[in-house]
Amino acid sequence: MEERKIKAVAIAAALLVSADIHAENEPVDIHASPKSETSDSDIAAVPFMFSTDSMGLSAGVAGVVKKAGQPQASLLGAGLVTDKGTWMTYLGAYNYALSPGSRWLFGAEFYSGDYKDFNYYVGKAAQNNSHADEMIIADAQEALHQLSARYILPIGQAKHDPIKAALYPSRKLTGHTPWESGVSSIDLRPFYQARKFTHNTQLPPSDFATNDSVWGLETRFEWNNQDRSANPAQGSKTQFKLTYAPDTSDQTSWWKWELNQSWYWDLGKWDNLFDQQVFAFNVYTADTPSWNNADAEHGYHRPPEYAGVKLGGLYRLRSYQTGRFVGRSAISYSAEYRVMPEWQPLGDWPVFNWYDVPWWQWVAFADVGRVADSYNVSELHSSMKWSAGGAVRFQVEGVVVRTEMAWGDEESIFRVMVNQPF
């Protein structure tokens, strides 16, 4: 079972209210009056309980407010406690605008957790040639706080009415460049991240920085040219991230870049069996160019492991736990064959018939990738790790829920999550 399950739940819940999963039959009216939208706010809260070996018996609650003061804005809160003493809290605010015609969208996320007897891969245990039993079991406090200021560029389909263009759940593809089609944006995200082990934890030697907290700025450049945000069948999505942490008395400067590229091809129907077939392909690669830079005062200009380039988790190498592999650089490939069966019985099933479930999807997927201590294309394509699996996904009240099983060299993992992985 995924050792960091609750952190994944928090992140997934945040995605639930993001711009990418507005209900396809519920477009955002950003020009509605604040008074009417506030009175029509959608509020929901869900208690949950689960048990795993690492977490113990866990209980919590998550709540969401859509149209929170503005028609396109949302709020999310989540928290849990366990019988082992672990606790987690999460609070997020998304898509707030200065005015309906503004090109800026603002948000914030605040996550804190105190974890007891958790599995961590640090030092050599996080390298590509490591083994699963090299983990340590430790207590740690973790945090990730960040603000977001997203500017929607006046090109492509966002030349006019930028917020609607960015948040509308579907769009017509009108070209193959950012100037012709899709929505392009720049997102500035100042952040603070920390992982503090208890004082009696014996940590192995590591090639990374040893500071237990870091702050800096993440800048995202994104071009979204998907035909639909919830379940794309055509187009592409490109995201390039630059993360920089400055020199301070408590940390050394470092920077890294990440490129995440996805494509989608509509393969059409298959007789009376499948209403839709889609082949989706994703490439992710990243590097830390400051890795070998050094000076007498600070040593090597490298991030701490928890802020480094990682593989494993919800989106890449899905048969491994989150952050299983960490290095200077990484490359990862994912392929999915997604089909929508013509047979759709969910509306007649117990529990499902309480909700609007317009479609479901069957998926076969495969991932390969690895981390390395240099950005060497040949090395990054040797001794690659792999994952393969299957998934069933369905849209519930406008939200894509994915249940998937992944197998790999070390273990198999079953997950329930929201949103497409790419």
Model regions and ranges:
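Outer-membrane beta-barrel initiation region
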Residues: 24-107, 116-118, 183-201, 206-233, ...
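C-terminal outer-membrane beta-barrel translocator/porin domains of Gram-negative envelope proteins
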Residues: 217-352
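Transmembrane beta-strand segments of outer-membrane beta-barrel domains in Gram-negative
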Residues: 26, 31, 50, 111, ...
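Residues on the lipid-exposed face of transmembrane beta-strands in outer-membrane beta-barrel proteins
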Residues: 47, 61-65, 91-95, 147-153, ...
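Transmembrane beta-strands of outer-membrane beta-barrel proteins
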Residues: 43-45, 73-77, 103-108, 184-188, ...
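Outer-membrane beta-barrel translocator/channel fold
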Residues: 79-154, 272-314, 324, 379, ...
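Transmembrane beta-strand segments that form the barrel wall of outer-membrane beta-barrel proteins
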Residues: 42-51, 61-63, 72-81, 236-246, ...
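N-terminal signal peptide c-region/cleavage motif recognized by signal peptidases
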Residues: 18-20
